[in-house]
């Protein structure tokens, strides 16, 4: 018997747990609770219900009902008995392959009811016995799903490192495509927006990992990651004019601020960009389980990209004009630009006496000179290390 995936995705569950446990998202707690209880009730997620009732961050929101829990446990055990029977039948009537398939189906059921402890244990047993690469890959996907549900990103990263060589060795097209979604989300969570954008944008047109997250969230994460990492030309082709993006963003009211933010930056509507960036910060960054840790960095980097885009067209620009373009005060622009200049995040200088921003973009010769100096320093360090090694050898003789 094969276990059907539940209709509620893994990241929908983990996002609801995040919203329920965050003290800053009290306005979303009731909706999160409704989402969780709908999934728990419809799919008999007894392990998840037990976890929520025992977790200090969520227990206060749970009106614990032992009878409800016991009724779900009973249904789980009845279902597990069917899987055990299938394993026994395979052992008596079939070969090792059929036994492993039956074990994998039981592991999939543990994954679907969010039973991490028993699910991981059975996945490990199946992985060790499996000889086919495809079976090993599927088992690792199940373990990654369980780690995602409980937001254990350290384990997700470890499992992905274990999974990638197996995919390269014997993964078919469908499994390779699934990996893009699984890995793209992880890379975004560790602030590797460039890597995340490459994978998520690439898998949008062939996305099939609905067990992990809904399609519109893949598009949303792809747009967010791409907006901060792609150059202007790629933003146009891969986001602004993308058929997949155009099929999702305009159709979802919740994504209107994200769509407006990307378009206003591309169209050089900087005051509109600043307004919509504030909305994106509130509605897409601070309230997201993966992006909340990076929202300050993200907003700051997007402002820097906007400043760089405007200054690229000028050798000099008055601070008054720049402030008017962004719809903010002169003092704000002065302070914000100054925060980027010391680290060379913006190639400009501010003349406060005359109220002018001068760009100082390095030309190609300067760039080549800096590269030669850098390579020379590396070579000099290597020669010094080599000399020290030779001298130590001479002293020993």
Swiss-Prot record:
Q: Which Pfam families match?
A: PCI, RPN7, RPN7_PSMD6_C
Annotated signal peptide: none
Q: Which residues form a coiled coil?
A: none
* UniProt entry tagged with the keyword Nucleus: yes
Q: Which key words are in the record?
A: Cytoplasm, Nucleus, Proteasome
Give the UniProt subcellular location, in the record's own words. Cytoplasm; Nucleus
Q: Which Gene3D superfamilies match?
A: 1.25.40.570
Q: Name one GO biological process term.
A: proteasome-mediated ubiquitin-dependent protein catabolic process
Give start and end of each PCI domain.
192-364
Any one annotated GO CC term: nucleus
The answer to whether the entry has keyword Nucleus is yes
Specify the superkingdom: Eukaryota
How does it associate, per the subunit comment? The 26S proteasome is composed of a core protease, known as the 20S proteasome, capped at one or both ends by the 19S regulatory complex (RC). The RC is composed of at least 18 different subunits in two subcomplexes, the base and the lid, which form the portions proximal and distal to the 20S proteolytic core, respectively. Component of the lid subcomplex of the 19S RC.
Q: What does this protein do?
A: Component of the 19S cap proteasome complex which acts as a regulatory subunit of the 26S proteasome, involved in the ATP-dependent degradation of ubiquitinated proteins.
Q: Can you name this protein?
A: 26S proteasome regulatory subunit rpn7
Species in which this protein is naturally found: Schizosaccharomyces pombe (strain 972 / ATCC 24843) (Fission yeast)
Q: Which gene encodes it?
A: rpn7
């Amino acid at each position: 018997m094969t276990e059907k995936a539940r209709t509620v995705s893994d990241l929908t569950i983990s996002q609801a747990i995040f919203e329920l446990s965050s003290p800053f998202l009290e306005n979303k707690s009731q909706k999160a609770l409704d989402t969780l209880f709908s999934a728990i009730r419809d799919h008999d997620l007894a392990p998840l219900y037990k976890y929520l009732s025992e977790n200090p961050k969520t227990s206060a929101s749970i009106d614990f009902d032992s009878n409800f829990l016991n009724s779900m446990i009973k249904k789980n055990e009845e279902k597990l008995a069917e899987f055990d029977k299938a394993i026994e039948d395979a052992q008596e009537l079939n070969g090792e392959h059929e036994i492993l398939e039956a074990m994998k189906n039981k592991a999939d059921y543990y994954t679907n009811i969010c039973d991490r402890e028993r699910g991981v244990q059975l996945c490990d047993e199946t992985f060790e016995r499996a000889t086919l690469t495809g079976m090993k890959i599927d088992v690792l996907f199940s373990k990654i799903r369980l780690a995602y549900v409980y937001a254990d990103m350290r384990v997700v990263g470890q499992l992905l490192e274990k999974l990638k060589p197996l995919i390269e060795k014997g993964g078919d097209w469908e499994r390779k495509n699934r990996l893009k979604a699984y890995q793209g989300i992880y890379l975004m969570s560790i602030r590797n927006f460039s890597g995340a954008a490459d994978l998520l944008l690439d898998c949008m047109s062939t996305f099939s990992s609905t067990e992990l997250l809904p399609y519109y969230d893949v598009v949303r994460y792809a747009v967010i990651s791409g907006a901060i990492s792609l150059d202007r030309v790629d933003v146009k082709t891969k986001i602004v004019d993308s058929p997949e993006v155009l099929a999702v963003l305009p159709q979802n009211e919740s994504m209107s601020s994200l769509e407006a933010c990307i378009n206003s930056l591309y169209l050089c509507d900087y005051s509109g960009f600043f307004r919509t960036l504030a909305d994106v910060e509130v509605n897409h960054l601070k309230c997201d389980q993966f992006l909340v840790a990076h929202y300050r960095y993200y907003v700051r980097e997007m402002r820097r990209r906007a400043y760089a885009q405007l200054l690229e067209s000028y050798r000099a620009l008055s601070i008054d004009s720049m402030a008017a373009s962004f719809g903010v005060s002169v003092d704000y622009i002065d302070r914000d630009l100054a925060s980027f200049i010391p680290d060379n995040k913006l190639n400009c200088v501010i003349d406060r006496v005359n109220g002018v921003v001068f760009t100082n973009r390095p030309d190609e010769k300067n760039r080549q000179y800096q590269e030669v100096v850098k390579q020379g320093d590396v070579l000099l360090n290597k020669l010094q290390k080599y000399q020290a090694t030779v001298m130590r050898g001479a002293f020993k003789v």
